[in-house]
Amino acid sequence: MPKKIILDCDPGLDDAVAILLAHGNPEIELLAITTVVGNQTLAKVTRNAQLVADIAGITGVPIAAGCDKPLVRKIMTAGHIHGESGMGTVAYPAEFKNKVDERHAVNLIIDLVMSHEPKTITLVPTGGLTNIAMAARLEPRIVDRVKEVVLMGGGYHEGNATSVAEFNIIIDPEAAHIVFNESWQVTMVGLDLTHQALATPPILQRVKEVDTNPARFMLEIMDYYTKIYQSNRYMAAAAVHDPCAVAYVIDPSVMTTERVPVDIELTGKLTLGMTVADFRNPRPEHCHTQVAVKLDFEKFWGLVLDALERIGDPQ
């Protein structure tokens, strides 16, 4: 049986690859794409979700816009990484085939979780955690019904927005605190893992050889992303963060994990937004959080390339 997921995202260059992977893998049933302010404003990331869905040939999957600001703090976006549009220099069509659902993303998440059998839906947030926290507060019963939360965010060794805080966490640390402290199972796919998911020249050559419109789209955004990484991050290749969370849902053996307590720093002058992972022994017996540690590089990129092949050239 395919694994049912709700992809809560802020597209975003690497979010686009996450959408392609979720749509193109037969082990995933994509129930909804929900959007949240993050890499760009809510209006821009929602438009980008429509764009990627059209390019991928996605039909029948609701796209719903969510929270346009964090729970407490001022909006922080990442145009310096993802571009003014949030999608590099990609051109937009006059209109989209995929329309935006009238429901608020938080309500859609609640509706889907409450209408499906318990423990059958995995939430996969790849942006800030505002929508997920709001859903848990608005309808607390979803916490026991959700199978797992597999999120891209955080980092137990280093940050990227600051020396210790990762972007998706620091843009709404209060929301992250709520999500990590609920009783559901949480898998944190953070920078320690995603910095291993590099779009190297040999990988991009394999994407090029797929030779479809979605593959060419991926190449275009990866070219932009790589140049940003080379100039801003001083890395030779871009780290493709968000699809790592989707890949874990498809096949947990794509990465190794360690079950450790994780909490979010909310008051530190230098450490706001830090995901504090406690690796000390003995580990708590009923720990509900785990962090991703080591990526199987070939298996991960094999999943992405296979998804591109399966998507083909949608009409």
From Swiss-Prot:
Sorted UniProt keywords: Calcium, Glycosidase, Hydrolase, Metal-binding, Nucleotide metabolism
Gene3D superfamilies, per the entry: Ribonucleoside hydrolase-like
Pfam families documented for this protein: IU_nuc_hydro (PF01156)
S-S bridge residues: none
Cofactor(s) needed by this chain: Ca(2+)
PROSITE patterns attached to this UniProt entry: IUNH (PS01247)
EC number: 3.2.2.2, 3.2.2.3
GO molecular function terms listed in the Swiss-Prot or TrEMBL record: inosine nucleosidase activity; metal ion binding; uridine nucleosidase activity
Catalytically driven reaction(s): inosine + H2O = hypoxanthine + D-ribose; uridine + H2O = D-ribose + uracil
Biological pathway: Purine metabolism; purine nucleoside salvage
Hydrolase among keywords: yes
Active site: H241 (proton donor)
Result, substituting H241A: Loss of activity
CDD domains, A to Z: nuc_hydro_IU_UC_XIUA
Binding site for substrate: D14, N160, E166, N168
Chain positions recorded as Ca(2+) binding sites: D10, D15, T126, D242
Gene Ontology cellular component list: cytosol
Gene Ontology biological process terms, A to Z: nucleotide metabolic process; purine nucleoside catabolic process
Subunit-structure text: Homotetramer.
PANTHER family found in the cross-reference section: INOSINE-URIDINE PREFERRING NUCLEOSIDE HYDROLASE, URIDINE NUCLEOSIDASE
Free-text function comment from the UniProt entry: Catalyzes the hydrolysis of the N-glycosidic bond of commonly occurring purine and pyrimidine nucleosides into ribose and the base, but has a preference for inosine and uridine as substrates. Is not active on thymidine and 2'-deoxynucleosides. Functions in purine salvage from the blood of the host, a fundamental pathway since protozoan parasites such as C.fasciculata are incapable of de novo purine biosynthesis.
Family membership: Belongs to the IUNH family.
Protein name: Inosine-uridine preferring nucleoside hydrolase
Organism whose genome encodes this protein: Crithidia fasciculata
